[in-house]
Amino acid sequence: MPGKLRSGAKLGSDGAEESMETLPKPSEKKTRKEKTKSKTEEATEGMEEAVSSKAKKTNKKGPSEDDVDPPKSRKAKKQEEEPQDDTASTSKTSKKKKEPLEKQADSETKEIITEEPSEEEADMPKPKKMKKGKEANGDAGEKSPKLKNGLSQPSEEEADIPKPKKMKKGKEANGDAGEKSPKLKNGLSQPSEEEVDIPKPKKMKKGKEASGDAGEKSPRLKDGLSQPSEPKSNSSDAPGEESSSETEKEIPVEQKEGAFSNFPISEETVKLLKARGVNFLFPIQAKTFHHVYSGKDLIAQARTGTGKTFSFAIPLIEKLQGGLQERKRGRAPQVLVLAPTRELANQVSKDFSDITKKLSVACFYGGTPYGGQIERMRSGIDILVGTPGRIKDHLQNGKLDLTKLKHVVLDEVDQMLDMGFADQVEEILCVAYKKDSEDNPQTLLFSATCPHWVFNVAKKYMKSTYEQVDLIGKKTQKAAITVEHLAIKCHWTERAAVIGDVIRVYSGHQGRTIIFCETKKDAQELSQNTCIKQDAQSLHGDIPQKQREITLKGFRNGNFGVLVATNVAARGLDIPEVDLVVQSCPPKDVESYIHRSGRTGRAGRTGVCICFYQNKEEYQLAQVEQKAGIKFKRIGVPSATEIIKASSKDAIRLLDSVPPTAISHFKQSAEKLIEEKGAVEALAAALAHISGATSVDQRSLINSQAGFVTMILRCSIEMPNISYAWKELKEQLGESIDAKVKGMVFLKGKLGVCFDVRTEAVTEIQEKWHDSRRWQLTVATEQPELEGPPDGYRGRMGQRDGSRGAFRGQRGGSRNFRGQGQRGGSRNFRGQRPGGGNRGQKRSFSKAFGQ
């Protein structure tokens, strides 16, 4: 009967002989013992409980319940076991008694034969190996076989029996064939003789049947149990349902909240939005949509690059298109959008035009002819975007009617209500607004920066029930979180050259960079500086409007890579793929820094903003850090290695763009050059020339001064003072080092110093210096972390005749800025007299910081 054990008496001689054939050799047993020795303690309690529970039940063909002896120790069992009437069994038993008891127990545990398994049992996975030294059954001749997962008539107690471990493939085992009830490797009853030689099927993956005849066998659960065929379809469907639920979980919350189906947006508008690459509403758009659509006044604040323009454009267009009346010629605008710059006004107008084909959108700003704008007003306008100056001109000339306004938007409201525009905005809005009237147009104010005074000024234009949406709130960081903020200390005389190196490393020839300057003159000069290898154009107020539009369009299209601009490009401009923003000096107000840095890192992209500063601008930089809630990472100028590496990458990219037809014309020259110089030398020279890096100046990593190399002297202990480093330098390099080192400052934790030396002195210093357990001298490849910002040079650059005042000057000037020399000193920062007793002159704090 399938699933039942036969008694040892009924096994017969054939079974015994077969068992003898399948017994493994002692060496094989020993090998298995060694492999499982480390696992002998895992299932001791479970196996003992299994033995005791199974000892209470017997096969119908085996001995009765009364004949079952209680479980005994392995030694006692071996002594009491007696051979059955089968001769083969007797000989086998006597042979096994000669083996050590431990090996006998192991063979009884692992080497078992099986009775005919059912189809379900044959399909089950192979069990794990049993622990060495633990018998899988009690008295083998008297007890039922150990089952897996309760199959083959399990009792309640048997269901809890731990699963035996897998036997090795191809190792047929048997206990005492005549005495013990044989077991399968998977815990089932013994198979027929034909089945013994059948190779075991390979392990199948979960959900796959081990047997090829799928129609006859039930599917397996993960735990190896068989299952009725009906639920099979359900189990196959489960992975699909699970994967679909996982897909839903993977959708970000922002996309779920911003799905178009959550808002009353027409299909036509959705198609136009998708054409612009907008597949869902951004957080600021989703949170303001219903306020704008329902006609409520609103003040909204969100970081740069988060999509504020569409926050008011989409709901206003849907509202106007929903109540669209007859399009009369000469109709007055219903929506007025005011922007601080011409470039921003032009961009907002384009955003409106891109998502509506039914409404008329016009843009009025200075620098363009009046005639075309007057003609647009005669034709009729639904949405008017413009700058305050030109809108005011049309009002004063009586050409523009704003009495029909229903919606007014002030983009970059903090600048629109500031002193520069406040009077013009007041004059424009007083035409459509009445004091304390509920019939005033809906007022919408948007910006990335909203100081407290903005709310006070804005209240006179807004209803008392206005809404406020602030996605920045009390968060410390006001600037874009997708932008990395870096700072480089550099004197203004070195600034242009260092900016050129920075662009090479952080943007390259293929990237786009915006450089912000404080004045129009600086912007014009920097755009024409030869240190900037990439094509550069300037954008400022003195450039004619037509040229400004051409320049901005060319930069958007990638016709040139560097745009040098004043604040006209700081606000609102959405220029794609700007990799780097450079600010030539800290701005006067933190709002300008936030808007400038926001030209990169837009719409989920990341970007870098680098701010240059001098000693006297440390205070301004700290103010930006405090108010913008950011922390600048102070870095040194790009090293020669970094510049060359970046330049070579750019040159290789340029090689990829050369067409094959052009290459064929240069093959003969290339072959000749390779013969003369060699392939590597020739190609390296070509790459250097293409990249423009034929000569790279070494620069100080402390203050960016050309012709200097920064070196680091590390100490294994904390240094009490800076003279501790000077003493070690003089001991190894001699007194002459006094004239070669300058700008020495502590490293973080005072575990060393860094200083500058002239480029030509580096090799000499490296040859003379010998590292010790306490001191190690290296050339810096990047700016080290300093104990504090260096307060200018206090070094020992002076001569013995008294010219060391500013740099350190123990004999030729003091260690402070004013160079209080004891024997004179002509090289301090403040000194006026070339010799003797130069004490410099005092300066006030405000003068020192240019305030």
Curated annotation (Swiss-Prot):
Lineage: Eukaryota, Metazoa, Chordata, Craniata, Vertebrata
Location of Phosphoserine modifications: S7, S13, S118, S144, S155, S181, S192, S218, S236, S243, S244, S245, S639
Protein name in the entry: Nucleolar RNA helicase 2
UniProt entry tagged with the keyword Nucleus: yes
Species, as recorded: Mus musculus
Enzyme kind, highest EC tier: hydrolase
Localization terms from the record: Nucleus, Nucleolus; Nucleus, Nucleoplasm; Cytoplasm, Cytosol; Mitochondrion
Post-translational modification: Acetylation by CREBBP/CBP inhibits the helicase activity. Deacetylation by SIRT7 promotes the helicase activity and overcomes R-loop-mediated stalling of RNA polymerases.
Region described as 3 X 37 AA tandem repeats: 117-227
Record field: compositional bias (Polar residues): 226-237
Region (Disordered): 1-260, 783-851
